[in-house]
Amino acid sequence: MVRHHQPRKGSVAFSPRKRAAKETPRIKSWPQNDEPKLLGLAGYKVGMTHALVTDSDKNSPTNGMDVFTPVTVLEVPPVVVMGIRAYEKTSRGLKVITEVLADNLDEELSRKISLPKEYNKSEAIAKIQGVLDKTEDIKVLVHTNPKVTSVPKKKPDIFECGIGGANPEEKLNTALELLGNEVKASDILNEGQFVDAIATTKGKGFQGVVKRWGIRIQYGKAVRAGKGRHVGSIGPWTPSRTMWTVAQAGQMGYHKRTEFNKKILKIASADEVDQINPDGGFVKYGLVKNDYVLVKGSLPGPSKRLVILRQPIRPNNKSEDMPQINYISTKSKQGV
């Protein structure tokens, strides 16, 4: 007799499937890196196109050939390091001791947070240096500049970013050098390297169990009665309650997701936007005006969504050779 085996439909790894708390993702884990630089960067998703890239994998049957490759375009205007935070280790995890803010902050930040009217930067730096002996980690506050892009908003996005260094003292010295300055994608990323992409996915609203969990559509009498797209049984008589693992209708999409080891194919400056802008601009975005990054494959979220690129926290052993791009499609994406 054939052994009957059917794994459950859908993964419970991401339960509860509810809306993300905020659109700008919060990153709790950063890789250990001794290089004195930021460990992450933010950009805005523009859209997708395709390119012909020479396959450099020696074990691939298409080695040395031009391969059709889908790519995602991210517009990455320079981000600004607006603050420094010192953390101490407590019995309940890391806790902020103190922080330093930069001078001459962008006036658009007042749309997002309350800025201090009177602030003594020198005293704040002296305070953070005074608690360095009990500091466990140093991180920086970074904000974006959406007003220079085609994203229709002026309010900056603020996120906390890890910084490289062997110890808190090295991290603090690097952070003080970067405080108040702009950081470009070319300063911290390289072509051919792998990064982690973190973003909030595209929202789908309230969906049924078939689309949300992928359960089988019932047949026969159930379909004729108009009940084909529902769960046949939501549990036994005892225990007299519904388990949380049972597939039910509800919110789908708009979740925080991380995609590991996405390859960067190209990092270009604002002078090279003609090589990527299609006829009529990208659908639901417009034209790229600043530095941009081409990432192999797809990324979470719709166009205009903030995507944070992080240094890989679980790097793979694949080659990080310089990609050779022979063609990038700039044909109109209207009606595609």
From Swiss-Prot:
Role of this protein:
One of the primary rRNA binding proteins, it binds directly near the 3'-end of the 23S rRNA, where it nucleates assembly of the 50S subunit.
Similarity comment text for this entry: Belongs to the universal ribosomal protein uL3 family.
What quaternary arrangement does the UniProt entry report? Part of the 50S ribosomal subunit. Forms a cluster with proteins L14 and L24e.
InterPro entries named in the record: L3_arc_euk, Ribosomal_L3_dom_3_arc_sf, Ribosomal_uL3, Ribosomal_uL3_arc, Ribosomal_uL3_CS, Transl_B-barrel_sf
* Pfam families in the record: Ribosomal_L3
Q: Which GO terms describe its molecular function?
A: rRNA binding; structural constituent of ribosome
| Region Disordered, residue ranges | 1-34
Gene Ontology cellular-component terms listed: cytosolic large ribosomal subunit
Instruction: Tell me the protein's name.
Output: Large ribosomal subunit protein uL3
Tell me the GO BP annotations in alphabetical order: translation
Which keywords does this chain's UniProt record carry? Ribonucleoprotein, Ribosomal protein, RNA-binding, rRNA-binding
Stored Gene3D superfamilies: 3.30.1430.10, Ribosomal protein L3, domain 3 (4.10.960.10), Translation factors (2.40.30.10)
